[in-house]
């Protein structure tokens, strides 16, 4: 959900919200999942069918939605972890971790296989050699997330205006919805001194 393009130093991709159990979970139906929505990043320049998915948030309570790039090293999202929707930011870091090897034998694709596994699949297919070998780059991605607002009423939706350093926020107060246009708050990113305390909600 809520996919948007991001470009950090050393990594570009699509950032999105999902209720998948982790970044390494196998493909499957997440519609019936009971997991919380967290923020994930998938690389978009990798041409192989194995795209690296990195989990950028790990909420204990509530859900994370509406992720987008905040500045060159931070992303932002809305979370109701404390019971009220607040803006959170995450500091993103990526380091090269090396190459993964793909071995293709018939319809089988083996990722970083041991020699014993390759021999077993070769004998299953009645072959003496692999069909082809491929490689793709792998990174170790990490993020540190923290609240940057502590509102009394829930932040319903947000969008980022990219190069203009602006964000929009929609809040509900009583029967009315309010739209705010705000500048990116670099001071709060540096200080990280906002605490979104748990509420009764």
Where do the model's predicted regions map?
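Surface-exposed intrinsically disordered loops and tails
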Residues: 127-129, 136-142
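Flexible, solvent-exposed coil segments and beta strand-coil junctions
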Residues: 47-51, 137-140
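A flexible loop/linker signature enriched in serine peptidases of the S9 family
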Residues: 1-2, 7-47, 57-63, 77-128, ...
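A short beta-strand motif characteristic of beta-propeller blades
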Residues: 52-57, 144-148
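Short coil/turn segments that connect the beta-strands within blades of beta-propeller domains
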Residues: 10-12, 72-73, 163-165
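Conserved beta-strand position repeated across blades of beta-propeller domains
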Residues: 4-6, 68-69, 159-160
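Short linear interaction motifs
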Residues: 68, 139-142, 146-149
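Signature of short aromatic-glycine-proline-rich micro-motifs recurring in repeat-based ectodomains
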Residues: 152-165
């Amino acid at each position: 959900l809520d996919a948007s393009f991001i470009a950090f130093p050393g990594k570009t991709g699509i950032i999105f919200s999902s209720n998948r159990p982790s970044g390494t979970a196998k493909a499957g139906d997440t519609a019936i999942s009971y997991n919380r929505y967290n923020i994930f990043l998938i690389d978009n320049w990798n041409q192989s069918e194995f795209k690296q998915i990195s989990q950028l948030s790990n909420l204990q309570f509530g859900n994370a939605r509406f992720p987008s790039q905040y500045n060159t090293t931070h992303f932002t999202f809305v979370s109701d972890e404390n019971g009220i929707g607040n803006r959170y930011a995450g500091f993103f870091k990526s380091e090269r971790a090396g190459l993964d090897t793909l071995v293709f034998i018939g319809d089988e694709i083996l990722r970083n296989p041991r020699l014993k596994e390759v021999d077993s699949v070769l004998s299953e297919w009645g072959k003496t050699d692999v069909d082809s070998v491929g490689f793709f780059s792998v990174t170790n991605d990490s993020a540190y997330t923290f609240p940057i607002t502590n509102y009394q009423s829930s932040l319903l939706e947000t969008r980022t205006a990219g190069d203009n350093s602006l964000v929009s926020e929609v809040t509900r107060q009583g029967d009315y919805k309010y739209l705010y246009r705000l500048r990116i708050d670099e001071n709060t990113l540096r200080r990280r001194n906002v605490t979104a305390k748990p509420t009764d909600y």
